[in-house]
UniProtKB/Swiss-Prot annotation:
GO BP of this protein: cilium assembly; microtubule-based movement
PANTHER family in alphabetical order: DYNEIN LIGHT CHAIN TCTEX-TYPE 5, T-COMPLEX-ASSOCIATED-TESTIS-EXPRESSED 1/ DYNEIN LIGHT CHAIN
Family to which this protein belongs: Belongs to the dynein light chain Tctex-type family.
Pfam families from the UniProt entry: Tctex-1
InterPro entries (UniProt xref): Tctex-1-like, Tctex-1-like_sf
GO molecular function: dynein intermediate chain binding
Protein name, entry field: Dynein light chain Tctex-type 5
Length: 173
């Protein structure tokens, strides 16, 4: 066997693949030619030394309490303002209200994030329904820390529709 073939067999044996060897080379080194494993890429160590990646060091804050509490009254005023401005003159239409729910949710979420409340996860739930002499009862249950987590909600009504909006602020430790 030539030196080139021996070197190729040695490299392939080192990588765990013999599938690319010719049948006479396989017989010469005593392996079967029915090898299944192949290697399509192998990173050689030492070739990427010239590429320098900046190291970013992050330190733990060890903060377990918020520096600023969730502003319930500010968020309630924000909900009142957004719901009134978007729904004051609207009549209930199924498709319009479906799209309006998504739009109002995104607007409320963006405005609450603009308050820059650090380390709080913001969850916004908006429900819009038609007023037709019916009763509705809505509720929510949460597993959270009473000392740090909170919520704010507002109910809006006009002649043809109602909207219930709730914003949950959950502290992220």
């Amino acid at each position: 066997m030539s030196d080139l073939a021996k070197e190729k067999a040695r490299l392939l044996k080192k990588r765990g693949s013999l599938s690319s060897l010719g049948s006479h080379e396989v017989r010469a080194i005593g392996k079967t030619k029915d090898s299944i494993s192949t290697l399509s890429y192998m990173e050689e160590h030492g070739h990427h030394d010239d590429i320098q990646r900046p190291t970013v060091q992050m330190e733990n804050t060890y903060r377990i309490t918020p520096s600023r509490r969730f502003p319930v009254l500010t968020v309630k005023d924000l909900l009142k303002d957004v719901l009134t401005s978007y729904l004051q003159e609207e009549k209930y239409e199924t498709e319009l209200c479906r799209q309006m729910t998504k739009t109002i949710t995104e607007v409320v979420k963006a405005r609450v994030k603009d308050l820059m409340i650090p380390r709080y996860k913001i969850i916004v739930v908006i429900s819009i329904g038609q007023i037709k002499d019916q009763n509705i009862r809505m509720g929510s249950r949460c597993l959270w820390d009473d000392n740090h987590d909170n919520f704010s909600s507002h109910i809006f009504k006009n002649n043809s529709l109602f909207a219930a909006a709730t914003v949950f602020g959950v502290y992220f430790e």
